[in-house]
């Protein structure tokens, strides 16, 4: 009886103990994780950082939750945040990793907190949580928290800081960023983490203490090709005058001002970062270095033209006075009107001089004289009126330029007939009242008229040059006159 009562009470005690609430705290983690006493949760171990030469054969080490991967250095890693089907809380732990596969470690029956991570050998290329392509590796992150409830769902659990119990009695992460329980500043961005959160600065800012300060990108060259302008949270590039930003907003390229907005009045030449203007012949750049001004060549020199310089836009021209024409662009040459057009009558002859022409009678003979040949008049011996007159008068004409240099030989007189036993003498009979001329005998039968004073025209001089012929025995005496008309032109050319 007593034995039966004891067994009954023991059974009730055991049944009652099954419904007693317990508080279970886990401080052990699965392989690949370690306990964080501050955050009160398991955190991943970075094997790539602590394991010397974790990967061999030129492979690179890639840390992963609960383990690491050895992948080719050229591999591209793509993180896939897709949530796979979560394991049941009572899953049994598998054995260690094998070469060529990835071994997943799950919760053990002893109550050790699983990490959901994995480890891979140097030749690992596939596994339950890794998908690979030819050179791409897609890693599936296990979103399950590194804590799970015991296999008995009737037990209460105590979650670490940053976690809360879900309706399924699972410790799930608290998203402080969406719940508004974070303490990030208004100029910061809240980033949720497993069991916690972090505050990050906006792009272009960096943390200094608890504050976000602007990053001066311009102090870290070479962001910009030429000029860098820092702005709050960013920067932009500027180019020097004559350059413009390229499509990459970094490089400065030269602006061809001659093609874009040609400001030159005449000729434009592009140079690196600028341009220069040039003018056509006959023009010069004005003070603004853009426009062209005409050069007044006539003011720069008085020797450009023989007579008169006329300035024109971009050039100049030379003019000559009436009776002259321009030759070789600058000099003046007399027009021989007697060979072209003149107004002389039929009984007149045309005589051209420098700058004009004159008409003289074809028969210039005076009274008592008879025209015997062209321009030669003879007074007959039979005429008693001729005894006191020169036997003959020859008419000659010449033209000289104004302001001719002196002394200068200008005309030679010579006897046309030579008599035996005679002596010839020469003199200026008339037309030299001011002493402009001098007659120098050069031989017994010739003399030279010399200009000794400069003459200015236009002017006409008529000079009678007389030759006296005397017989050496005194039986013969005669004279003849050369009437020379000298026309002085109006100019020195």
UniProtKB/Swiss-Prot annotation:
Domain EGF-like: 26-71, 173-213, 214-253, 254-293, 294-333, 334-378
One Pfam family linked to the record: cEGF
Tissue: Expressed in the eye in the ciliary body, cornea, inner nuclear layer of the retina, and in the optic disk.
Transmembrane regions listed in the UniProt entry: none
GO MF term list: calcium ion binding; epidermal growth factor receptor activity; epidermal growth factor receptor binding; growth factor activity
Secretion signal, residue range per the UniProt entry: 1-17
Subcellular location(s) per record: Secreted, Extracellular space, Extracellular matrix
Keyword Disulfide bond appears in the UniProt entry: yes
UniProt entry tagged with the keyword Secreted: yes
Major place of residence: secreted
Covalent S-S links between cysteines: 177-190, 184-199, 201-212, 218-228, 224-237, 239-252, 258-268, 264-277, 279-292, 298-309, 305-318, 320-332, 338-350, 344-359, 365-377
Chain spans, region Mediates interaction with TIMP3: 259-493
Assigned protein family: Belongs to the fibulin family.
Role played: Binds EGFR, the EGF receptor, inducing EGFR autophosphorylation and the activation of downstream signaling pathways. May play a role in cell adhesion and migration. May function as a negative regulator of chondrocyte differentiation. In the olfactory epithelium, it may regulate glial cell migration, differentiation and the ability of glial cells to support neuronal neurite outgrowth.
Record note on quaternary structure: Interacts with ECM1. Interacts with TIMP3.
Protein name per its UniProtKB record: EGF-containing fibulin-like extracellular matrix protein 1
Species of origin: Mus musculus (Mouse)
């Amino acid at each position: 009886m007593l034995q039966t009562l004891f067994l009954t009470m023991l059974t009730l005690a055991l049944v009652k103990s099954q419904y007693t609430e317990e508080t279970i705290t886990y401080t052990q983690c699965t392989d690949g994780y370690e306990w964080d006493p501050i955050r009160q949760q398991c955190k991943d171990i970075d094997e790539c950082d602590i394991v010397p030469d974790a990967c061999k054969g030129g492979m690179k080490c890639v840390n992963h939750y609960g383990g690491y991967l050895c992948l080719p250095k050229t591999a591209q890693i793509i993180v896939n945040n897709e949530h796979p089907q979560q394991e049941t809380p009572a899953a049994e732990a598998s054995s260690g990793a094998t070469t060529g596969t990835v071994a997943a470690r799950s919760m053990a029956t002893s109550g050790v907190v699983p990490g959901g991570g994995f480890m891979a050998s140097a030749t690992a290329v596939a596994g339950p949580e890794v998908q690979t392509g030819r050179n791409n590796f897609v890693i599936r992150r296990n979103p399950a928290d590194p804590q799970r409830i015991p296999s008995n769902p009737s037990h209460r659990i105590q979650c670490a800081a940053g976690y809360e119990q879900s309706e399924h009695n699972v410790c799930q992460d608290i998203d402080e960023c969406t719940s508004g329980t974070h303490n990030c500043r208004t100029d910061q961005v809240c980033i949720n983490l497993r069991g916690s959160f972090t505050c990050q600065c906006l792009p272009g800012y960096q943390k200094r203490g608890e504050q976000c300060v602007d990053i001066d990108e311009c102090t870290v060259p070479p962001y910009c090709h030429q000029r860098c302008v820092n702005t709050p949270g960013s920067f932009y590039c500027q180019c020097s005058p004559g350059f413009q930003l390229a499509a990459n907003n970094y490089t400065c390229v030269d602006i061809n001002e001659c093609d874009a907005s040609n400001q030159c009045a005449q000729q434009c030449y592009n140079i690196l970062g600028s341009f220069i203007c040039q003018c056509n012949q006959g023009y010069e750049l004005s003070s603004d270095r853009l426009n062209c001004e005409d050069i007044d060549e006539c003011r720069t020199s008085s020797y450009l033209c023989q007579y008169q310089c006329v300035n024109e836009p971009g050039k100049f021209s030379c003019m000559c006075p009436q009776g002259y024409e321009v030759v070789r662009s600058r000099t003046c040459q007399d027009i021989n009107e007697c060979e072209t057009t003149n107004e002389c009558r039929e009984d007149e002859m045309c005589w051209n001089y420098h700058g004009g022409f004159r008409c003289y009678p074809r028969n210039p003979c005076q009274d008592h004289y008879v025209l015997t040949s062209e321009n030669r008049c003879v007074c007959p011996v039979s005429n008693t009126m001729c005894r006191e007159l020169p036997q003959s008068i020859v008419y000659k004409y010449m033209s000289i330029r104004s302001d001719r240099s002196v002394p200068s030989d200008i005309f030679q007189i010579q006897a046309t007939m030579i008599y035996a036993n005679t002596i010839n003498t020469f003199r200026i009979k008339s037309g030299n009242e001011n002493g402009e001329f001098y007659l120098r005998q050069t031989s017994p039968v010739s003399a030279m008229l010399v200009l000794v004073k400069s003459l200015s025209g236009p002017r006409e001089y008529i000079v009678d040059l007389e030759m006296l012929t005397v017989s050496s025995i005194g039986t013969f005496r005669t004279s003849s006159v050369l009437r020379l008309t000298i026309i002085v032109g109006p100019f020195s050319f």
